[in-house]
């Protein structure tokens, strides 16, 4: 079955940010009543969709939100090691025409699926990330940009034989790759890097100059023209390569610093011919290329990656399929406290006597004369036939020990001998994010790497 996922970042995320910003200014801290103190990734919902191959998109009306919280099966703590900023994965592929970075254009325009419309950076086979500074006037990229691993520095420029110019930005951390790298996304390291005008590049440096019009009648050579870079910065220098009596390329020898804009003119020494060449300088972001990869690559996604390890010490049933994954913030224990444990079973456990027949996943069970007049109703998340334990979700009414609990579909009848409510107060906390998925079948010996990508 295809792994179809449809997600929703709820308005909680926005209101929490607004309150956090308010309290940061007012009290000097980012704390607000909605601010994250304890966040958990949960799995839930055993009911089949009308079409399991095409689950419906989640909505956030209150009926749905409450239903999601009532159908939680288990929740696992999210720590800082479970989170990482990610950007769209763009692998270098030969024969592709890449866009190139232009400081005078918005590089982060997106399509209806929120994917970049300008593919101006790539990842190579060594997980090095480069920005394209020139695409040979719309030519195909046929030479992979690569720097010797272990010798990379942000801002290193490559001019390749296919006419492309690249500048090195960063390398994907091997430790992050295991949990935060997939077919669509790749991780970026969170550190102290930021757009910093006190760095050598200052407000910006000139890393490339691209020839848009080659001109004519120039004298072949590298010292037969004068390249002048003007702007509000200082120190940038370059020379032109001339052959076939045209400007073929302009090579930057000194990038200078503190440029917010620049222009280039090509003139000739007295007595030399040539005219009409036009060239456009490319000015870096504040601090220089590679000084702040998260902002330079337009990162607006946060991946949450949590692994469920089998039964998690008996906390999570393994004989189930789940169809929802999400994040709940600040749920409460039945005591009213904020939970701090790593893993919680959020189902009620009903221990029953030995007998015949098996309860069915997804069926309703009840106590009373019939389902319509029942004093207690629950939905079967899992039936542990080896230990005679029902895992129940979405319970209603008051459970009574010593009374029969009857399967509305299976007709199975056993007597309840012990009933343990979930430690988590069902319905508590804020639903931050939820995904409706095609069913994911758990197994006793299997692990699930659950990844959620939040878009801001």
Features from the language model and the residues they span:
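Acidic (Asp/Glu-rich), glycine- and aromatic
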Residues: 144
């Amino acid at each position: 079955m295809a792994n179809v996922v449809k997600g929703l970042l709820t308005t909680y995320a926005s209101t929490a940010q607004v309150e956090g910003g308010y309290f940061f200014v007012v009290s000097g801290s980012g704390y607000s009543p909605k601010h994250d103190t304890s966040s958990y990734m949960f799995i839930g919902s055993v009911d089949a969709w009308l079409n399991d191959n095409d689950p419906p998109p989640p909505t956030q009306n209150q009926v749905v939100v409450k239903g999601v919280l009532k159908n939680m099966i288990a929740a696992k703590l999210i720590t800082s090691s479970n989170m990482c900023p990610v950007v769209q994965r763009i692998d270098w592929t030969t024969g592709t025409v890449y866009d190139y970075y232009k400081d005078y254009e918005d590089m982060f325009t997106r399509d209806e699926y929120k994917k970049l419309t300008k593919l101006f950076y790539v990842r190579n086979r060594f997980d090095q990330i480069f920005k394209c500074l020139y695409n040979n006037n719309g030519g195909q990229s046929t030479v992979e940009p690569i720097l010797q691993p272990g010798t990379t520095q942000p801002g290193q420029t490559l001019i390749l034989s296919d006419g492309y110019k690249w500048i090195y930005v960063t390398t994907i951390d091997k430790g992050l790759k295991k949990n935060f790298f997939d077919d669509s996304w790749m991780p970026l390291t969170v550190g102290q890097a930021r757009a910093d005008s006190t760095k050598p590049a200052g407000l910006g440096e000139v890393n490339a100059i691209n020839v848009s019009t080659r001109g004519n009648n120039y004298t072949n050579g590298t010292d037969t023209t004068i390249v002048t870079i003007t702007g509000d910065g200082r120190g940038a220098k370059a020379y032109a390569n001339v052959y076939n009596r045209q400007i073929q390329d302009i090579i930057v020898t000194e990038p200078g610093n503190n440029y917010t804009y620049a222009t280039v003119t090509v003139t000739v020494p007295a007595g030399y011919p040539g005219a009409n060449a036009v060239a456009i300088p490319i000015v870096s972001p504040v601090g220089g290329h590679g000084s702040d990869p998260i902002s330079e690559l337009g990162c607006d996604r946060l991946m949450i990656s949590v692994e469920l390890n089998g039964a998690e010490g008996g906390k999570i049933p393994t004989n189930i399929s789940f169809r929802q994954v999400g994040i709940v913030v600040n749920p409460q224990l039945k005591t009213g406290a904020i939970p701090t444990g790593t893993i919680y079973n959020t189902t009620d456990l009903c221990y029953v006597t030995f007998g015949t027949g098996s309860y069915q996943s997804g069926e309703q069970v009840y106590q009373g004369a019939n389902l319509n007049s029942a004093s207690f109703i629950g939905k079967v998340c899992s039936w542990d036939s080896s230990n005679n334990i029902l895992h129940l979700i979405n319970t209603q009414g008051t459970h009574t020990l010593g009374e029969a609990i009857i399967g509305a579909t299976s007709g199975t009848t056993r007597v309840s001998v012990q009933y343990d409510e979930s430690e988590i107060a069902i319905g508590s906390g804020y639903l931050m994010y939820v995904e409706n998925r095609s069913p994911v079948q758990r197994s006793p010996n299997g692990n699930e790497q659950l990844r959620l990508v939040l878009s801001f």
